[in-house]
Amino acid sequence: MDKLTTGEFLANRPSSGDITLDLGAGQAVELTHLEKVYWPDEGSTKGDLLRYYVSVADFIMPYLQDRPAILKRYPNGIRPLPAGAEVKRKDRGTDFRNRDGGFFQQNLDPATVPPFVKTALLTTIEMAHPVNYAVYTNLATLLYLVNLGTIAHNPWHSRLENLDSPDYIVFDLDPHVAPWENVVQLAL
C-alpha cells in the first residue's frame, strides 16, 4: 500500500487502489477503494470525496470537534434501490437502509475501529439501550468515517462534555413529495 502525505494526496490525485495517508505527528489512516464511483451521473469517486474532506478539514473540524456522530453511509455510492427491492431495517434501530442505497449508523464497535477513533457510550431518549457513537476529534477520525462510506454527516448539536446543552439548532426541511415552493415559503 502506497504511503502519501496529504499534500501528495491532493496533488497526485491517485485514482485507484488503497493508500496510507500520512497526516503527520505519527498519525496515518488507511484509505481504500479510491476508484469506487459514489456519484455515477457525475463520475465522482470515493477518492474525490476524501480529497474534498482533506481540503476543507481546517474549516469544518472546529464545528465538528468533540461531537458524537450519526453517519449516513453509502458504501456503494448513491444508487437508488431497484423497484421492488427490500429496504432492510435492523431491529434495534441503530442502522437502517434507505431507498437511495444509504443507511444510518450510530453504533460503532470500539473493538473494530482504529485506536485514534474515539467512541462514547451514550443512552438517549430515543434509544433505550446504550450506543457507541464515534466522536469527531481530528482529521484522522473524519477520514476514517468517510472511508467507511459516510457521505452525510449528522453531528450532534452538542459537544461531548456538555451533551444536554446544544450550541446550535438546525431546521431540517425535507420536502419529500411537497413542491419546492412550499419549502421556500415555510423557510421564510
Regions inferred by a protein language model and the residue ranges of each:
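Active-site loop/lid in soluble adenylation, ligation, and acyl-transfer enzymes
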Residues: 10-23, 27-167
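N-terminal nucleic-acid-engaging modules of covalent nucleotidyltransferase systems
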Residues: 1-12
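A generic structural motif
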Residues: 37-38, 175-179
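Long, well-ordered alpha-helical scaffolding segments within enzyme catalytic domains
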Residues: 52, 181-188
